[in-house]
Amino acid sequence: MESSSSGTTSSTIQTSSGSEESLMEQRKRKRMLSNRESARRSRMKKQKLLDDLTAQVNHLKKENTEIVTSVSITTQHYLTVEAENSVLRAQLDELNHRLQSLNDIIEFLDSSNNNNNNNMGMCSNPLVGLECDDFFVNQMNMSYIMNQPLMASSDALMY
């Protein structure tokens, strides 16, 4: 009987070792499936991140292009305004010079008028009176001087 009990024990051991191997094999397959699923989820996350970053890059490139265009337009406007401003400065200088010249003429006429009034008494108002023979005193000649056009060109601009 001894032999029969040892035979059942060995078959039980073989069966239990077979079931352990089967159980280990199942666990191994389960781990493999779990690892595959985890790797698939990881790849999906990476792909989503890559897609998001690509979309962000495209958006930033578009925004950068818009900013560069805006800066270019603003620079052109600035240069145009700067050129116009330079012309206006030149015209201002010319007008100031002409005003100073006219003030000098008026001052000269006033002093000349005072001398003439003291000496001859002929001209009472140098800007209105036609009785004076002086070229600068004659109103027709004064209108000629005052109606000269202003000349300013962008070529002669000084900053």
From Swiss-Prot:
It comes from the Eukaryota. InterPro entries: bZIP, bZIP_plant_GBF1, bZIP_sf. Coiled coil: none annotated. Keywords: DNA-binding, Nucleus, Stress response, Transcription, Transcription regulation. Transmembrane segments: none annotated. Residues 25-88 form the bZIP domain. CDD domains: bZIP_plant_GBF1. Induction: By light. Induced by hypoosmolarity. Repressed by sucrose (at protein level). Pfam families: bZIP_1 (PF00170). Residues 1-47 are annotated as: Disordered. One of its GO terms (cellular component) is nucleus. GO terms for biological process: negative regulation of translation; positive regulation of DNA-templated transcription; response to sucrose; sucrose induced translational repression. Residues 27-48 are annotated as: Basic motif. The keyword Magnesium does not apply. A highly conserved upstream open reading frame (uORF) coding for 42 amino acids is essential for the BZIP11 sucrose-induced repression of translation (SIRT). Plants over-expressing BZIP11 show severe alterations of plant growth and development, reduced seed set and viability. Forms heterodimers with BZIP1, BZIP9, BZIP10, BZIP25 and BZIP63. Interacts with ADA2B. Transcription factor that binds to the DNA sequence 5'-ACTCAT-3' in target gene promoters. Promotes POX1/PRODH1 expression in response to hypoosmolarity stress. Positively regulates the expression of ASN1 and POX2/PRODH2 genes, which are involved in amino acid metabolism. Regulates several metabolic pathways such as myo-inositol, raffinose and trehalose. Regulates several trehalose metabolism genes, including TRE1, TPP5 and TPP6. Mediates recruitment of the histone acetylation machinery to activate auxin-induced transcription. This is bZIP transcription factor 11.
